[in-house]
Amino acid sequence: MSSRPQVSVISVKGEQGSSQLPLPAVFAAPVRPDLVHSVFVRVNKNKRQAYAVAENAGHQTSAESWGTGRAVARIPRVGGGGTHRSGQAAFGNMCRGGRMFAPTKTWRRWNVKVNHNEKRYATASAIAASAVTSLVLARGHRVEQVKELPLVVSNEFESVTKTKDAVAVLKAVGAHKDVVKVIKSKKLRAGKGKLRGRRFTQRRGPLVVYAQDNGIVKALRNVPGVETASVKHLGLLQLAPGAHLGRFIIWTQGAFESLDSVYGSDSTKSIKSGYTLPSNIISNTDVTRLINSAEVQAVVRPAGEKTQKKSHVLKKNPLKNKQVLLRLNPYAKAYAAEKVGSAKVEQAKVKPSKGQFAEVLKN
């Protein structure tokens, strides 16, 4: 998140004006790379075009199994003779010319649901990350000549209609170096995408966000890597391409001023229904500094000595190891001293003799 309270407005000639704009509250939103990646993966799936293989692919031949008893697999085989194809296996996914396993269908569930508030949270997080210079540089953007981030240009930029004039503005504000990087990055794609309309790959350049389109979209649409978007229709696919935070964004003054009305602030309600701008749970993210502060350490009891837990327990037989036996049964020592185990058990019932039994019968 950015901590500067004021942002300067740059003219289309690259001059820093006297006007200062307060930093919108959305730039104080938490930067959540985990949330941005999760939302991006799901949102990016929603623009896929349905595809499937032909229903009869791999089955356009007459083949039957030979059955058992011929010392070959029971896979269906092409009949006939006079050609190499006869006798070859068919239909199975392991066969040459056979169908694929689980043929793809157009009724696959292509669309993935994303919670509305989760999408808005990720968008706000991506906007906040665009003001952090380290994240913008880490993403690969060339912003060494940019005076400050976020970069705000006067509203005259929205009225530019010629591409050469738009490029001149980019050079004046120090953003053209990023366009040159895009031009040099154009390479032939590896793989079959070359045959499917995706012949080249190139990096992403700056994103220009405007409030009103007075010709800026047509002026910039042919500049390599440069994209345009309305401040009211910002999406995560443009703010964080590839789920990587830190897109280089050029704001027009009108778009920058309307961020508080679009996403809300402490004093302004968002135009998005039922939306509240996310905020940090703690203002200082340096938890180590908080824990080691004098105020916290004054009420925290001192840490005890470190105890190392035994990695494993040595198992011994208590019947053979006397020390282990005494640990399990402390009475075993007295039991052995009294020789209780070797003493004979007293007879509970004495068997009468024959004489005693005869006297009982007489009585």
UniProtKB/Swiss-Prot annotation:
The keyword Cytoplasm applies. Keywords: Cytoplasm, Ribonucleoprotein, Ribosomal protein. Transmembrane segments: none annotated. Its main location: cytoplasm. It is found in: Cytoplasm. GO terms for cellular component: cell surface; cytosolic large ribosomal subunit; membrane. It comes from the Eukaryota. The keyword Ribonucleoprotein applies. GO terms for molecular function: RNA binding; structural constituent of ribosome. One of its GO terms (biological process) is translation. Component of the ribosome, a large ribonucleoprotein complex responsible for the synthesis of proteins in the cell. The small ribosomal subunit (SSU) binds messenger RNAs (mRNAs) and translates the encoded message by selecting cognate aminoacyl-transfer RNA (tRNA) molecules. The large subunit (LSU) contains the ribosomal catalytic site termed the peptidyl transferase center (PTC), which catalyzes the formation of peptide bonds, thereby polymerizing the amino acids delivered by tRNAs into a polypeptide chain. Component of the large ribosomal subunit. Mature ribosomes consist of a small (40S) and a large (60S) subunit. The 40S subunit contains about 32 different proteins and 1 molecule of RNA (18S). The 60S subunit contains 45 different proteins and 3 molecules of RNA (25S, 5.8S and 5S). Belongs to the universal ribosomal protein uL4 family. This is Large ribosomal subunit protein uL4. It comes from Candida albicans (strain SC5314 / ATCC MYA-2876) (Yeast).
